[in-house]
Amino acid sequence: ATSVRPVLYDEDGSLGVVVESGRGSLPFALCHGEALVACAAWALGEAGVTQVDMGTPWEALVEAEEPLVLHDPLCPMTPADFIAACVERCAATQAVVVGVRPVTDTLKAVDADGVVQDTVDREAMRQVTSPIVLPASVVAGLAGLASTDFAELAADLAARFPVVTLEAPAEGRRVGDEDDVRVLEALTAR
């Protein structure tokens, strides 16, 4: 018997890119035996997003008149249903939607001389994860991406367009090295 997975989002369609540039070789590390970049691509497909190549001309993305989902392969286990929820929120609000995680580390302010000052309230802080979903109107209003660093991109977009954040589940966390990949692998073991 053939098993068919349901497409989670297929309203009017959306395009998606796995943004691997500027991330070194880490997108090709293995999690559960698969490259992080492959895991990210599968999540886009399962969310009903049509994947396009990072090299697709920006003008073609504008002409498509569809939302654009940017997915970071360093958040490889972001669930498809979360990506679909971000696309749905983008369609409902016409705002840029950014996946975020709470900051759990203790943060300290440092003065100009490098002297540690006060503890920063981490409740007000969020770590940008994945995805970032751009409504078609925002895609049309840009000449391209200002950055492929998601934190920088989110800040740039927030300065120019309405932005809504959605809290990503724990498995949507960002990895920064092979040790983080092992932690994520343990977190998502089935």
What do the predicted segments below correspond to?
Residues 1-56:
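N-terminal glycine-rich phosphate-binding loop and ensuing alpha1 helix
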Residues 7-13, 61-64, 90-93, 158-160, ...:
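Flexible, charged surface loops at secondary-structure boundaries
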Residues 37, 71-72, 102, 135, ...:
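Residue-level signal for inorganic ion chemistry
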Residues 45-69, 76, 82-88:
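Short phosphate-binding loop-to-helix
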Residues 74, 170-173:
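Glycine-rich "substrate-gating" loop/helix at the edge of Rossmann-like oxidoreductase active sites
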Residues 77-168:
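Conserved core of the sugar-phosphate nucleotidyltransferase
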Residues 175-190:
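Hydrophobic helical membrane-anchoring modules
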